[in-house]
Structures are given as structure tokens and as C-alpha cells.
Amino acid sequence: MKRYIYLLIPLLAFALVGCEDELEEKAALDVTVSSTGNVTWEGNTVVVKKGTPLTFDFTGNPDFITFFSGESGHKFIYRKRDQVALEDIVSSKLSFSVWYQYGNAATSVNLLKLYLSETFPGLAKNKFEADSVLVEGFAWNDLIDPSKMPTAPSNAANATHFEVDFTPYLGKRMTIAACYKPVSNAAAQPRVNIVGMKIVNTMKDGTTSTLFAGDFNFTPINMMCHHRLNDQRSMTVNREYGSVTSSTSGIWNLSGATKGDFFIHSSNSGAKLKYSWLVSNMILANACSPDYGQPIKNVTKGTSSYTYIYKTAGTYKATFVATNSNYKAESQVLRELNIKVVE
């Protein structure tokens, strides 16, 4: 009898492990919309007046629900898209603003130069001397005419705006670079703020796709890193290619690059002159960030409905993605609704 018990124990353990690999419940979700004064049905299409709260009611209890409104940037079918077909693009524009902070006109002279190239070979990123020689000696093209750059400190409200036609570069791999090189320390060496840098591609159907500077994968080349400057001593890691999130003079801060915002910190009057480059990876102008949805339910946040407001007239395909998952398995269902938004 004992022999049979011993044989059963490993069999039971195997069965229990097998159960853990399976989901306790498959994902299930149904979505309905109730008709109201400004919400009606036309066949299988929900018709709603622009600006009217539209409430989706749920049955089923999945662990997670993600909502794709169907608007530009939030289309389920483009959730994995990283490039836009060239034939679908009408125009491509790189835009951003620049303003200097601190210092004066004398310390702003030739402060920043912005470059572009379709032949730059790329940085090694682990051979600092070779990379620094490469960027200094390379035959860059001006992205912005130096005479158009700011000539004195200003403020965000008076930033200089630039828009560059990127349509000629569609399908090409481009590199963008910035060179920060103050020529005077008689006053503070200005902080340079670059705001909202992005490539916007406009499609034939009027929709747009946006690639922010965070996707350019900029790499700093901190040319003064081996000088052991007193106002850079707080930077103890990756001094050659690193950026910072705190105030370190003459070092790039890329923490806002996902929205196109980045800057290089200022230096006090009399401080050693700073010198730094910022170089992107090769950029495909028709690249785009994947569309994304809005998480509206998770295992700690329950909901039986969700309200959304469409602000622009048009037709949309709203998609709800319901998911149950554990570390071994996943179950997912989609529910789609055609939405027509009218004036």
C-alpha cells in the first residue's frame, strides 16, 4: 500500500503544476452603449454628437482592459507600427523651438550649432577619442542657418521656432547633431533649451504620425570629460557619453526627450568654457511611434463602464482589448465598435 502512495505523490504534484500553468478563467468582455438624446444607433454604428460624453458599459470581468479610441495615435491596428508607408505621406516636417537662459548677448555668440547628415557613419559609443575626432572633423550640413539662431538670452514665451521640410529625406537615414561651444565666460555660459523637437508626417487622409526626439536616441559626447572640472565633479558615471537629471554644468539633460524637450546646463561666470556634442542615431524620417491605448482596468482597479468624449467629427473604430494572464498563459479578446461623431 505504501508503494502506491509514494507513486501517487509525484503524479499529484505534476497535476498541480499543470493546473498553475492554465488560466483559471478565459478573458470575456461584452461592450454596449446606451442610446440617449445625443447618442443613437445607425445599424452597427454608434452616432454621437461631438463633445458628448459617450459611456461604454461592460459585462465580463477580465483582469485588464485597454481602450483604443480610433483617433490618430490611438488606433489598435497601428499598435505595432514603427514606420509609415512612403506612398501614404503627403508632407514631413521637423519642428522645434530654441531659447537661451542666463548669461548675456556676448556669451550667446555662436553658442549652438545644429547639423544634419545623410552620410554620417554613426558613433562607436565605446571609443571616445575616435568619436570626438569624428564629430569634429566630419563635413556636416547645417540643419539651421547659424544666422537664424538666437543671439541673446530670452524666455520660453519668446523662443525661436524652427520648421524644416523633411519630405526630401523620406526613406533616407538621417543624423541630427547639436554642438554646444560657448566662446566667452565673462558672464554665465547660457543654458540652451530645445523644446518640442519632433517629426510630424501628414498622411493623404489628413491624419498625422509623430516621432519625438526621444526616439532619435541622442548620445552626448562630453568633450570636457577628462578635464575633471570642478563644476562637473558630481558626474561620476559615464562621463564620456552620459547625460544627467540633476544640475551639472555643461552636461545635457535628456529627461524630457520623450516629449521633445532637452537642454544643456549653464555654467557660472568665470567657469571653464564648456564644450559638448549631442548626436542622434540614424533617423528614418518616416519612422513613427506605435499607437497606444488607454489602460482603464487592471487587477487593482475595477470598472463596469468607461466614459470618453470625442472632440472632432469623423468616423472611428473604438477597440477594447480584454486580457487575463499569468506568467505562463494569456487569454485575450477584442471588442470593436464603429463610432460616427457628428457636429
PLM segments and residue spans:
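Extracellular carbohydrate recognition and processing domains
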Residues: 133-169
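Short, solvent-exposed loop/turn segments at the edges of extracellular beta-sandwich modules
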Residues: 183-185, 323-329
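Bacterial Sec-dependent N-terminal signal peptides
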Residues: 1-4, 9-40, 341-343
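Extracellular beta-strand-rich recognition modules
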Residues: 92-100, 112, 116, 172-182, ...
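Exposed low-complexity, polar/acidic, P/S/T/G-rich flexible segments that act as propeptides
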Residues: 185-234
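C-terminal edge beta-strand
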Residues: 195-198, 329-341
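Residue-level signature of extracellular beta-strand-rich folds
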Residues: 56-59, 67, 320
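Residue-level recognition of secondary-structure-to-loop junctions
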Residues: 168, 305-312, 316
